[in-house]
């Protein structure tokens, strides 16, 4: 009996010591948790006020409409197309197209500065994207806005080419490119690819809209509003060209398809389409002058 009691006594004395150590360690964990958690909360809240990560930016329009607006880019296409109609209206009102050049340059400078600010200030980038996000692609959150390339292409055309060539290049960018993107996304998988991210279906759409655009502009608007054109502003006319209206329109469709389909140094097509279409259309008209 004495031996058993002697053996039992150490066990009985060790158990309270073990429990005491466990209680002390649990208390130390609780104390450290109480100390560290508020510190993390304070740090994270102060960081959030100063820096908003670009990866946390979400476009409101994409959240509201989900994959539909992301896939079909409805507001962006409406914006692109509307520029063509607005320009056509200004043409009928006799606005001097050369007077548009400086407003385009000012717009480019302002938007470029805004992009520099937003790409270096995440909080401003978040506000900017939530304001005009419906007109942006997701990749443009992290890089320069496509509108910059759009304006730069128009500056090139308005500065170096005649009135009709400049307007045609803008119409092809507004309407042929929109048609190519819409049809290409819908039916492009059914046709062969003609270039990187370019399908035969999209090229056919660009060609068709290009033909219609040239025929309507040169066949109706130029003669109907001839009084708004100064001498030398319109390069093509039936009297000065070996091309008929129908042939010119067909070649205009080819220009639209080529300009939309060519991938030039992986540059943004908002820049390459007006530049290439201006160069091609100008070459076509001058080549067939009488």
UniProtKB/Swiss-Prot annotation:
Glycosylated residues, chain numbering: 11, 197, 270
Membrane topology term: Multi-pass membrane protein
Biased composition (Polar residues): 23-33
Residue ranges, Lumenal side: 1-77, 125-140, 185-203, 266-290
Post-translational modification Phosphoserine, affected residues: 44-46
Any single GO CC term annotated in Swiss-Prot or TrEMBL for this entry: nuclear membrane
UniProt modification remark: CKII-mediated phosphorylation of Ser-45 and Ser-46 regulates its function in the production of PA.
Single Gene Ontology MF annotation: ATP-dependent diacylglycerol kinase activity
Impact when changing residue 184 to A: 70% reduction in kinase activity. Not temperature-sensitive for growth. Regular shaped nuclear membrane structure
Main location: endoplasmic reticulum
Regions of this protein lying in the Cytoplasmic compartment: 96-103, 162-163, 225-244
Subcellular location: Endoplasmic reticulum membrane; Nucleus membrane
Keyword Zinc annotated: no
Family the entry assigns: Belongs to the DGK1 family.
Misc. remarks from the entry: Present with 784 molecules/cell in log phase SD medium.
Entry protein name: CTP-dependent diacylglycerol kinase 1
Organism: Saccharomyces cerevisiae (strain ATCC 204508 / S288c) (Baker's yeast)
């Amino acid at each position: 009996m004495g031996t058993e009691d002697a053996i039992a006594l150490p066990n009985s004395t060790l158990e309270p010591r073990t429990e005491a150590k466990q209680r002390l360690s649990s208390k130390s964990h609780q104390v450290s948790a109480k100390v560290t958690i508020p510190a993390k909360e304070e740090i994270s809240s102060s960081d959030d006020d100063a820096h908003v990560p670009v990866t946390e930016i979400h476009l409101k329009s994409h959240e509201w409409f989900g994959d539909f607006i992301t896939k079909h880019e409805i507001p962006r296409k409406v914006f692109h197309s509307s520029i063509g109609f607005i320009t056509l209206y200004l043409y009928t009102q006799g606005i001097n197209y050369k007077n548009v050049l400086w407003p385009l340059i000012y717009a480019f400078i302002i938007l470029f500065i805004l992009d520099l600010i937003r790409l270096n200030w995440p909080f401003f980038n978040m506000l900017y994207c939530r304001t005009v996000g419906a007109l942006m692609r997701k990749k443009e959150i992290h890089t320069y806005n496509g509108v910059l390339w759009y304006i730069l292409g128009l500056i090139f055309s308005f500065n170096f080419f005649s009135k009709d060539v400049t307007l045609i290049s803008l119409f092809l960018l507004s309407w042929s490119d929109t048609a190519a993107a819409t049809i290409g996304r819908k039916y492009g998988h059914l046709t062969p690819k003609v270039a990187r991210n370019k399908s035969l279906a999209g090229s056919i759409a660009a060609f068709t809209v290009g033909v219609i655009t040239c025929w309507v502009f040169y066949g109706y608007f130029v003669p109907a509003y001839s009084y708004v054109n100064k001498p030398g502003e319109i390069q093509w006319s039936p009297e000065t060209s070996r091309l008929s209206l129908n042939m010119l329109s067909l070649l205009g469709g080819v220009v639209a398809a080529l300009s939309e389909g060519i991938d030039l140094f992986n540059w943004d097509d908002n820049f390459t389409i007006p530049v290439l279409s201006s160069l091609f259309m100008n070459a076509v008209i001058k080549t067939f002058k009488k």
